[in-house]
Amino acid sequence: MEQTFSVTTAQRLDTFLATLLNLSRVKVAKLIVDGLVSVNGKKITKNGWLVQPEDRVHVNWSEELFEKVPVEVQPYDFPLDILYEDEQIMVVNKPNGLISHPTSFNESESLLGAALFHCNHQPVFLVHRLDRDTSGVIMLAKNQSSLLHLQKQLQQRVMKRYYLALVHFPLDSLSGTISAPLERVGNNKVMWKVGNSSNKAKNAFTKFTVLNQNEKAALIKCELLTGRTHQIRVHLQFIKHPVYNDPLYGLKSEQATEYGQYLHAQQISFIHPTLNKEMGFEAQLDKTFSDKLDNLNLKIANSLYALFQ
């Protein structure tokens, strides 16, 4: 089915199509990434492309494109940045753009698949997940016993996870805790929002500390006290400091690039499931994130690295 629409107000391409086609952002993203959308005759593959008044948007799609397939982890020959590995666990620095787990929309190239390939098809399990465009430390277990041990640490907040987030605008408070329950946005299977105390909303808590800021932006450290989907991104949007380049929760006026949100899982600490000793690991920023900080004149002062210890 081919359709053409005229734009009346400036907005993101994915938002524009999601509204007109009554599709989720995930489905719209698939249309765009698969090259089925053009603007003024030019094929566009960036979800965050900003369309302007009088632009003509053409899309060629059908519901059959979104038929789900059974999710099965396929070995994926992909080089992993392994921070630590033994017979029980793996700690990996996940790159931006790689999904943690395969999806039901024929997306099989995942970090879990890469770990499966690395382990010669021996069982391996995700202890937690990171969003596709969130880079940084992620943990995997090599057996059910270690998996349960580590997931229990998550639930009891023994495991500590620290993130770096680049956000818009300077913050008035240099530290604090965001306490705001999260729930889905209507029937949308992708987006979340701050809800109320209804049964649908789940309690969520995020601690933050400003590491550096100027008149345009701030680099902040976030600690997850709970682990809800998109928690940091939604919480920072809620306090009106959205993450830079966030395709779902960023500024509407911002034309997001393929890199996605500037959010990085910087550090993790936990008790090893069999050695019974505390361990901690840090993942370095990639060049794109680091260059962005340079462009905005934002760096972490050496004295502030202690905040991650």
From Swiss-Prot:
EC numbers for this chain: 5.4.99.-
Keyword tRNA processing: no
GO aspect biological process, one term: enzyme-directed rRNA pseudouridine synthesis
UniProt-listed Gene3D superfamilies: Pseudouridine synthase, RNA-binding S4 domain
PROSITE patterns attached to this UniProt entry: PSI_RLU, S4
Ranges of residues in domain S4 RNA-binding: 11-87
Pfam entry (one): S4
Swiss-Prot/TrEMBL keywords: Isomerase, RNA-binding
Entry annotation: catalytic residues: D131
The UniProt record lists the keyword RNA-binding: yes
Catalytic activity, reaction form: a uridine in RNA = a pseudouridine in RNA
GO MF terms held by the record: RNA binding; rRNA pseudouridine synthase activity
InterPro entries: PsdUridine_synth_cat_dom_sf, PsdUridine_synth_RluA-like_CS, PsdUridine_synth_RluC/D, PsdUridine_synth_RsuA/RluA, RluA_PseudoU_synthase, S4_RNA-bd, S4_RNA-bd_sf
Family: Belongs to the pseudouridine synthase RluA family.
Name of the protein this chain belongs to: Uncharacterized RNA pseudouridine synthase MG209 homolog
Organism whose genome encodes this protein: Mycoplasma pneumoniae (strain ATCC 29342 / M129 / Subtype 1)
